[in-house]
């Protein structure tokens, strides 16, 4: 650490509290301006229960990357549907309507990276 400025933040998932996001998924915010030195993006873990989905939505300002850690799902972006699973990275441009379903029998767990960082106000619900 130099002076009063923090140079590094390490946040362990176990220290974060889950909350239900505007799209209906359970979120754990891992890194964002609210809890770290990060200013221009955010990283969160999302969990979607078997047989459920997020609600279709879009972000006027933010682009997103989903990275699937566990489970099986179906991703919809602007009407296109694709099956997704572990180790798949999904690019979601700003303004693109999107939704993800858990099509498996275990929780669908993914990382969500938003740039600029996630804000509830930048989420517009379609459904």
Regions found by a protein language model. Give the residues of each.
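Conserved short histidine dyad/triad with adjacent acidic residue
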Residues: 29, 44-59
């Amino acid at each position: 650490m130099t002076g009063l400025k923090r140079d590094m933040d390490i946040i362990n998932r176990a220290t974060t509290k889950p909350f239900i996001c505007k799209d209906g998924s359970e979120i754990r915010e891992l890194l964002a301006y609210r809890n770290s030195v990060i200013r221009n993006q955010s990283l969160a873990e999302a969990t979607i229960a078997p047989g459920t989905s997020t609600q279709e939505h879009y972000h006027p300002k933010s682009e997103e990357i989903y990275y699937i850690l566990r489970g099986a799902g179906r991703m919809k972006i602007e009407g296109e549907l694709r099956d997704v699973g572990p180790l798949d990275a999904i690019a979601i441009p700003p303004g693109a309507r999107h939704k993800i379903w858990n099509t498996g029998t275990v929780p669908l767990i993914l990382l969500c990276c938003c740039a600029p960082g996630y804000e509830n106000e930048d989420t517009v619900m379609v459904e």
